[in-house]
A protein has these predicted regions:
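N-terminal Rossmann-like dinucleotide-binding module
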Residues: 1-43
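Short beta-strand segments
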Residues: 6-8, 64, 144
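Alpha-helical structural signal in soluble globular domains
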Residues: 20-24, 43, 78-82, 101-109, ...
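Acidic-histidine catalytic/liganding microenvironments
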Residues: 24, 57-58, 122
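Short, well-ordered coil/turn segments that N-cap beta-strands
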Residues: 27, 61, 84, 111-112, ...
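Short, Asp-centered acidic motifs that coordinate Mg2+ and/or phosphate
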Residues: 31, 62, 142
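Beta-loop-alpha module in the N-terminal Rossmann-like domain of NAD(P)-dependent dehydrogenases
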Residues: 45-105
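A contiguous active-site-proximal alpha/beta segment in oxidoreductase catalytic domains
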Residues: 93-144
C-alpha cells in the first residue's frame, strides 16, 4: 500500500490525481497540504498548511507536488530528504541548477523522483510526433 501526501489542491489534483489515488486499491490518500485546509474535507483526510509537519505526521510514503512552479524544487527536495518518493508536476524546476539539486536529493535519499509528463501519451501528441517524423509539418523550433 502506497500512502500519498498531495501538496496543492488545484484543478490537476482535484480532477485527476486525487481521484486516481482513491481509485487505485494499492494507494491511499494520507493527507493534503494546502493553504485552505477545508479543501481536505471532501476527501475525509487531514490537511496541513505546513509541509514539514505533514511529512513528519502523515505517515506518507510518497508525495505528489502540484503547487506553483517556483515551489516544485524546494518542496520536492524537502520531501526527498524526509525519505519520501516524489512525483512532481511539470515543469520539474525553474532552471537546470534546481533540477540538478532535485536529482541529487533523490540520489542521496535513495528515493524515486518522477515528473508527471502524462500528456506525452495523448493520441494527438503521438500524431503530432508522427507528422514531425514524416516531415509533414516541418521542423519544430519552439514548444511549450
Amino acid at each position: 500500500m502506497l500512502h500519498w501526501l498531495v501538496i496543492g489542491v488545484g484543478d490537476i489534483t482535484t480532477k485527476r490525481v486525487i481521484p486516481a489515488i482513491l481509485a487505485e486499491p494499492r494507494s491511499r490518500l494520507a493527507g493534503i497540504v494546502t493553504r485552505t485546509p477545508a479543501k481536505a474535507d471532501a476527501y475525509g483526510v487531514r490537511a496541513w498548511t505546513d509541509l514539514t509537519r505533514a511529512l513528519a505526521e502523515s505517515g506518507c510514503d510518497a508525495v505528489y507536488v502540484a503547487t506553483p512552479n517556483c515551489l516544485h524544487a524546494p518542496q520536492s527536495i524537502e520531501s526527498l530528504r524526509a525519505g519520501k518518493h516524489v512525483l512532481c508536476e511539470k515543469p520539474m524546476a525553474l532552471n537546470f541548477a534546481e533540477a540538478c539539486s532535485m536529482q541529487q536529493a533523490a540520489a542521496q535519499s535513495g528515493r524515486t523522483l518522477g515528473v508527471a509528463y502524462y500528456r506525452r501519451c495523448y493520441p494527438k501528441v503521438n500524431r503530432a510526433k508522427e507528422l514531425i517524423a514524416e516531415g509533414a509539418i516541418g521542423r519544430p523550433v519552439f514548444a511549450m
